[in-house]
Amino acid sequence: NAFNYTDADWAALEARRYDTTEHPDRPWVVIGDDGKYHYYGNFDWYHSIYNTNRFHQEHNLSLSGGGKDVNYYVSGRYYQQDGVLGGNMIRNKENYKNYSFRAKFDAQLFKWAKWSTNASLNAVNQKYPGPLNEAQTIAALEENVAPMFVPYNPDGSIVMYPADLRNVALGKGRTAALADPTNKHTIENLSLTLSNSLQLKLHKDLTFDASYNINNYRRLYKDRTAANIYSDAVGVTKTTTHYQKDTYRERPYEYTYHNVDAYFTYEHSWNKEHNFKAVAGMNYEKYRLVDNIVEQFGLGSDQIDSFNSVNDDTYWLVQQ
C-alpha cells in the first residue's frame, strides 16, 4: 500500500467522492494534530494541468501592385496559439507566437538593366513551464498523481511529498515544478532570407547576371529551473534538489550562409540553323555555424533570469 491512510481516512475520502469542488463541511486539506497536512480531495488534475480548450488566432495581410516597370508584393502574418500545459494551476502557461513577413520587388531600371529582390523574415517565440524536458514531464505526470492530493496547501505552499503518501513525490516532482512560476523556458527563433539579382543586357548577344543571397537563422534557448520548495506541515518549508537545481541556461545557435553568383552568357545564331552559346562565371559560398551551451548553477534571485544573478556557490558550465 503506497498510502498512509487509516480506516477513518478512507471513510473521509469516501464521503467526498461526489464533491467535484471543495465543500465547506468537507475540506480537502485538513491539519492533523501533528501539524501535518492530510489530503482528502477529489481533485481534477487533468483539467488543472492541461488546457483542453486551446485558443488560437491568425491574421494575414498582403499588398501587391505595380506598373509598367515596377511590380511589388508584400505580405505579413501573425499566428498565436495557447499550449497544452495551460491549466488553471499553472501560472506560466505554455504559449506559441509566430510573426512572418515577405516582400518581393521587380524593377526594369533601364532597357538594358533589370533588378529584383526577395526578402523574408520569420520570428517564433515559444514559452513553456515546468522542467526542461517537456516530453518527459508529460510522461511523468502519469505516476502518483492521485485525486486525493492537491497542488497547493491552504497557505499557498506547494505540495510535493504529502504525508499521506509513502515518501514518493507527486508526478515524480513534475507537479511541484509546474506549480512553481520560477520554472520557465523560452525558445526564440529568427530566420532571415535575402536575395538580390541583377541582369544587364550588354549586347544583343551578351548578358551579365549577378546574384547575392544570404540566409541567417538564429535560435536561442533560455531555461530557468529552481530547486523544489514545498511544505508538508504548517509553517514548515523544505527544499530538495533531487529532481532539479537552481540553474539558468542559455543555448545560442546560429548559422549564416552567403552565396554569390556572377556569370556572362554569350548566345548567337547563324542563319537560324547554327547556334552557339557560352557561359563563364564564378560562384562563392560561405557557411558559418555556432552552437554553444552556457549553464549557471546557483542563482542569487528567483526574479532575474540572467547570468548576473549569482550567489556564493555559483559556478558555470560551458559547452561548445
Model-predicted regions and their roles:
Residues 50-53:
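Short Gly/Pro-enriched turn/cap motifs at secondary-structure boundaries
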Residues 1-42, 79-191, 209-211, 215-320:
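Surface-exposed loop/interface segments of Gram-negative outer-membrane beta-barrel transport/assembly proteins
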Residues 65-67, 107-108, 198-204, 266-268:
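Residue-level signature of outer-membrane beta-barrel architecture
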Residues 55-57, 99:
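Residues that act as N-cap/strand-start positions at coil-to-secondary-structure junctions
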Residues 45-48:
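Surface-exposed cleft-lining segments at the edges of enzyme active sites
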Residues 58, 65, 195-200, 214-216:
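Alpha-helical support elements that line or immediately flank enzyme active sites
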